[in-house]
Regions:
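Hydrophobic core of transmembrane alpha-helices in multi-pass small-molecule transporters
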Residues: 34-54, 260-285
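Helix-loop-helix hairpin linking two adjacent transmembrane segments in secondary transporters
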Residues: 84-130
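Flexible cytoplasmic inter-helical loops of multi-pass small-molecule transporters
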Residues: 131-152, 364-368
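Extracytoplasmic gate region of multi-pass secondary transporters
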Residues: 162-214, 318-323
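A late C-terminal transmembrane helix in Major Facilitator Superfamily
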Residues: 301-333
């Protein structure tokens, strides 16, 4: 749709659907009230959130990049990558505050709904802000020159170069980012709580600090990609993740065990945070240039569909299934670390493929 009717209309549709679905979760009836319809409604709303988020991520990347111009494009567009960690940070803070002021019974009864109610305010602000946005200059030029494609997705699959770049985006950039996001932002907390048995409050504190560290690291990676190119930065992040994941989680277990043995000593916590920050570096190197790369890889007339499809497939197939695969391997091998070989091998393979085939796009014109 973004290649046919414009970047801005799709931008408006996705935020409206996502916001309404999120707000509705906060008003869902319980199983005791409506029975089986409660989980059915929840799954339906989650699917709607997923579908709208799919259009949002690729569409916002194209929209922002086409407005960014040619100078410091990587740095300007890297701000978009902060939104995911920022959401995790605010949700963690909300839950921490609610748990602090509410009893466990109150939180289970209605407290969990509060973040979903608050999202109504965010939805109103987002819709008003986006109504003031302008269509991208690239799409306006396409419309004036009658270069728009009626079947952009079909055109993408017919063009050999576009097909190749869609695969590279899927396998190396988007899947690599999804794998690292899971390992750095999601699995570290699960691992520290379930395997190491650290107190949830301590884990939440560590997660907040590591997420805060991710913000400047991501912006720096985007800026650095403007200086040395997107390709070397992305490959560095993939390689660093492949090398560092296994030893990092082993260090997390060792340091966490030391902390449990002497909880009044802060040194293990400081080193735990350093390990988490090291993992954040690998994630930042991949996602920092990612927004610009999504748009720069493809021609303007089919850019939105060419960037959105592989990016969403990578998030769903690779990122979405990663927790299941890691957990299954851990159970089969009876180890807390065995499953981590899957993301390690995936990242190493992605780095090799990117080194061999990923083109440098830093100086590409977005009007072509």
């Amino acid at each position: 749709m973004g290649d046919r009717i414009g970047r801005k209309p799709v931008f408006m549709i996705t935020i409206a659907l996502m916001g309404l679905a999120t707000v509705c979760v906060g008003f869902l009836p319980t199983y005791a009230q409506v029975g089986i319809w409660a989980p059915i409604l929840l799954v339906s709303l989650r699917l709607l959130q997923g579908l709208s988020a799919g259009g949002e991520i690729g569409g916002s990347a194209v929209y922002l990049t086409e407005h960014a111009g040619n100078e410091y494009r990587g740095f300007k567009t890297s701000f978009l990558q902060l939104m995911g960690p920022l959401g995790i940070l605010f949700s963690t803070l909300q839950i921490a505050v609610l748990r602090n002021y509410l009893s466990p019974e109150e939180f289970e009864a209605w407290g969990w709904r509060v973040p979903f109610w608050i999202s109504l305010v965010l939805l109103i602000i987002a819709v008003k802000a986006r109504m003031a946005l302008e269509e991208t200059p690239v799409f306006l030029q396409l419309s004036k020159s009658s270069q728009k494609t009626e079947r952009p997705l079909l055109s993408n699959f017919r063009d050999p170069q576009t097909r190749k770049r869609m695969f590279l985006l899927f396998f190396c950039i988007s899947a690599g980012g999804a794998v690292l996001f899971f390992c750095v932002q999601v699995y570290t907390s699960i691992f520290l709580k379930t395997s190491v048995k650290l107190p949830p409050a301590v884990v939440d504190q560590l997660s907040i600090y590591s997420t805060l560290a991710l913000f400047p690291l991501t912006l720096f990676a985007g800026w650095l990609s403007d200086k040395v190119g997107r390709k070397p930065i992305v490959i560095s992040g993939l390689l660093l993740g492949a090398i560092f994941i296994q030893p990092a989680f082993q260090m997390l277990q060792t340091l966490g065990t030391q902390y449990l043995g002497a909880p009044n000593i802060n040194n293990p916590l400081i080193f735990l945070e350093l390990v988490l920050t090291g993992l954040s570096v690998s994630l930042a190197l991949v996602v920092g240039p990612q927004t610009a790369l999504l748009a720069e890889l493809f021609a303007a007339k089919t850019r939105n569909s060419a960037a959105t499809l592989p990016h969403n497939l990578a998030a769903g197939w690779i990122g979405g299934l990663l927790p299941l695969i890691v957990t299954w391997i851990n159970q089969e091998w009876g180890s807390d670390f065995a499953g981590l070989w899957y993301p390690t091998i995936f990242l190493a393979t992605g780095a090799i493929v990117a080194f061999m085939y990923l083109p440098e796009t830093r100086n590409n014109s977005l009007l072509d």
